[in-house]
Amino acid sequence: QVIQTRPLDGGAWEDVSGARVPTHRPLRVQLPSGRPFHVFVFHGPLSRDAAFAGILSSGERLLDTARGALDGIPEPSGMVLLASDGETFGHHQRGAESSLAEALLRCRLSGLARVTHLEEVLDQLPATHEARVASPSAWSCAHGVGRWSRNCSCRMSHHDGWNQEWRAPLRSAVVSLRDRVFSLVERHGDGLIRDPWQALEEY
């Protein structure tokens, strides 16, 4: 998603598309409004291995793979961010939650790294570079936001004849249903709810 970076104090933009995006510290993105917004880029190889390569089969294997990612950090105070769906742990991969707990314990006892959260990282490791992000884009799809509306080729299995052509008509049906519901809320909601739109937003 990040396509270019440059130092905060100015200079030329550097192309970081592909696998060259710096992932060891946050990046600052300037929104169209002029307000700054910080982004964190997850460690691609480590995150993919957690999802697909079986490293969550044991805490030791997860920690060994994470150690390799940590060794690649260009500065001692940098971070490594593993991004994964929460349902990976115990749903997609049975026992992965136990492996994660074991890896976190081993990490703490060995002093290899400190487990933290992104707010603390941003506080202690401020951005030194600003970034430009491809638009539109989604972290879970290499084709922009196509996986939510069309046959973008992202799929669970690569069986012959399988595709996602159903996405466009499904999206159209959901949008049509949304518009119909909005129409009904506008027509009948005032007599039932003090503020129908606020109720919808707070639902």
Feature locations, PLM:
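Nucleic acid-machinery interaction/catalytic patches
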Residues: 5
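Active-site and substrate-binding clefts of carbohydrate-active enzymes
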Residues: 13-47, 55-203
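Active-site-adjacent loop/helix micro-motif of nuclease/hydrolase catalytic cores
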Residues: 51
